[in-house]
Regions:
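Class II aminoacyl-tRNA synthetase catalytic cores and aaRS-like
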Residues: 1-185
Length: 185
């Protein structure tokens, strides 16, 4: 909350709504993942992506959007901004697409904007949410940090949607029934 207050005092909006991402992580990986370093340099593709910070390690930040993850390269100008980020913050980045020495795609942080400040930072990747009780009580955190749980919910949602469409096509009527009510009947 202190960082949020400091951001407000500097005149910045902690929750701007003017950034429009043009690409997703999966789209970039699928479209440019097989390119060579030289081909990407020659292409000079500028991309715009938004995502949640899940790792922040010096020169590289890893962000996750709804489709996957991608690395961001922290330029010299972006270092103060990168140091102010916490795990869970959502950022918008515009910059050139490159290939690292290890063959991973990354976006150079030419333009950057904080879209949402995380009031409660996420657990780090190595420790995560190990306590089962905590995972159930903080389901939203579990969905953010655990891809297997997120995938389970995606599959469940698709199954429920399929059943609902099938029954609607057969002219069934959906009726909500209270299940967690204190008053019986």
């Amino acid at each position: 909350r202190a960082k949020l207050t400091a951001l407000r005092e500097q005149g910045g909006s902690p929750f701007p709504n003017d950034f429009r991402p043009q690409h997703s992580a999966a789209e970039l990986q699928a479209g440019f993942g097989e390119e060579t370093k030289a081909a990407l340099e020659e292409l000079g593709k500028v991309v715009s992506i938004a995502g949640r910070v899940i790792r922040n390690r010096g020169a590289f930040i890893v962000v996750q959007d709804s489709s996957g993850t991608i690395q961001l390269y922290v330029t010299k100008e972006a270092r103060p901004f990168a140091k102010s980020l916490d795990l869970g913050d959502i950022v918008g980045i515009t910059g050139a697409l490159h290939l690292s020495g290890k063959g991973d795609l990354y976006v150079q942080m030419d333009q950057y904007q904080l879209l949402t400040k995380a009031l409660r930072p996420l657990p780090d990747k190595f420790h995560g949410l190990a306590d089962q009780e905590m995972r159930y009580r903080q389901r939203y955190v579990d969905l953010i940090v655990n891809p297997d749980v997120r995938n389970t919910f995606r599959i469940r949602s698709k199954v429920v949607d399929f059943i609902r469409r099938y029954l609607n096509a057969a002219d069934y009527l959906e009726v909500e029934t209270p299940m967690l009510q204190v008053i019986l009947g």
